[in-house]
Amino acid sequence: MENRSFYNEILTEHNVHPEFKHDLPDADIVLEGVNPNCGDDIWLKLKTDGDTITDGAFVGDGCAISQASADIMLGMIIGKKKEDALKLGDTFIKMIKGEATEDEIEGLEEASALRDISHMPARVKCAVLGWHTLSQALNGKEKK
């Protein structure tokens, strides 16, 4: 129960006081992610230098889970190589599907606060929206 309370605090903090929810006009990778089931809608904006993500932000509206997940994700990927960011995304998706090892989950740091979402099927798409958008953006499906 103590852990669940801690995880709820993490999610609430990232939803109420997101560090990365703002515009990023000079982003060179921009992609919209939409969850039509509940109306979550984010625009992921990344600034890159070669293979490194140097800055990132998101704008949009959605439930607390989608907003917190996107904010946590950006905190994890800024400063990382694109390849490493994609690996984090793959691990996050594995965690949500209940397929990640404890070591992999620990490597997700604050994103592990979303691990129990796997038991809430209606919220899975909310949690993975930012991560799926990241994968699409880094694999060349961005809009300009």
Annotate the PLM regions.
Residues 1-25, 80-144:
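C-terminal binding/interaction regions
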Residues 17-60:
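Structured beta-strand/loop patches that form or line metal/cofactor-binding pockets in enzymes
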Residues 42, 71, 125:
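Active-site phosphate/pyrophosphate-handling residues
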Residues 38, 63, 126:
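Functionally engaged cysteine thiol sites
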Residues 61-67:
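Short, thiol/selenol-centered motifs that function as redox-active sites or metal-ligating centers
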Residues 67-68, 87:
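Alpha-helical macromolecular-interaction surfaces
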Residues 69-79:
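Alpha-helical support elements that line or immediately flank enzyme active sites
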